[in-house]
Amino acid sequence: MDSKITRLIEQASVIVGALPYLQAYRDKTFLIKFGGSAMDDARLVKKLMRDIVLLEVLGFNPVIVHGGGKAISKAMAEAGLEARFVNGLRVTTPEAISIVERTLSGTINPGLVQMFRDYGGKGVGIPGTEIFVGERIHEKDEQGNPIDIGEVGNVIGCLTERITEALELQITPIVSPLAKELGTHKPLNVNADLAAAALAKELKPVKLIYISDVPGIMKDPSDPSTLIKSVTRTEALDLIKDGTVSGGMIPKIHSAIDALNAGVRKVHFIDGRLPHTLLLEIFTPDGIGTEIIREQR
């Protein structure tokens, strides 16, 4: 058989292999959060936007929450402001919050929307301040003394009307990670992972997918071959207790479990540095990253 025909048959087989997933997930909501160094490579971002457009065309309902930490640090440096962190939280002065808001909702978000539309998608940008309700975080040092970290908050609620309206029109919402402070209505800088989990608790998507710059949960963080493909909520907590999961992955895991407890079916952690990582996770039996599930296998 001609080699070209063979390749075409193989491509057709891949499409047919996706049939069970297309049948299972059509008209279902997927909440996709991406950030980290994966956002620094424009080629990867464009490929990801194209893949999400494909999901939209196939009848899925994607919702995107994006990050932008490195772009914020760059914008602050250009403005002569030093990036400082306390307990992993970016210190955000009143002067800095305007830069954060301008970078996230005024630069990154419209750029992603334009990429999405360039591939034929029907995306709409929504500032996080129209979705997330926040309260200010009050940090303390080791002696218990208060530390002022500025305009930084936790998400305590979500206003989902704009998102549900967009989904009803088969338009993909693309949301920036900012919250409006309860009472004052001032913008607050919030963790994008935790914001995505809070939104997932309200929307209850079939999947909450975190796309970052790590392959997933690994027994040895320096060895990708130790990737753990699937864990339950209890097993994930055990990985934190025994030290397998540490650092920045801990709040991600806790937020994932909160989402599962609220009704999300599965949470996935995948590597955004790999082309088509999202499609491989959704449309193949074994996936490419780590999934956290509610039920025992």
Curated annotation (Swiss-Prot):
Protein name as annotated: Acetylglutamate kinase
Coiled coil regions, renumbered to chain: none
Primary enzyme class: transferase
Protein family per UniProt: Belongs to the acetylglutamate kinase family. ArgB subfamily.
Role played: Catalyzes the ATP-dependent phosphorylation of N-acetyl-L-glutamate.
EC number: 2.7.2.8
One Pfam family here: AA_kinase
Residues reported in the UniProt entry to bind substrate: G68, G69, R90, N189
Compartment list: Cytoplasm
Residues carrying the site annotation Transition state stabilizer: K33, K252
Record's keyword annotation contains Nucleotide-binding: yes
One cellular-component annotation, GO: cytoplasm
SUPFAM superfamilies, A to Z: Carbamate kinase-like (SSF53633)
Swiss-Prot/TrEMBL keywords: Amino-acid biosynthesis, Arginine biosynthesis, ATP-binding, Cytoplasm, Kinase, Nucleotide-binding, Transferase
Major localization listed first in the record, in broad terms: cytoplasm
Catalysis: reaction(s): N-acetyl-L-glutamate + ATP = N-acetyl-L-glutamyl 5-phosphate + ADP
Pathway in which the depicted protein is active: Amino-acid biosynthesis; L-arginine biosynthesis; N(2)-acetyl-L-ornithine from L-glutamate: step 2/4
GO terms of molecular function: acetylglutamate kinase activity; ATP binding
Taxonomic source organism: Akkermansia muciniphila (strain ATCC BAA-835 / DSM 22959 / JCM 33894 / BCRC 81048 / CCUG 64013 / CIP 107961 / Muc)
BP GO terms, sorted: arginine biosynthetic process via ornithine; L-arginine biosynthetic process
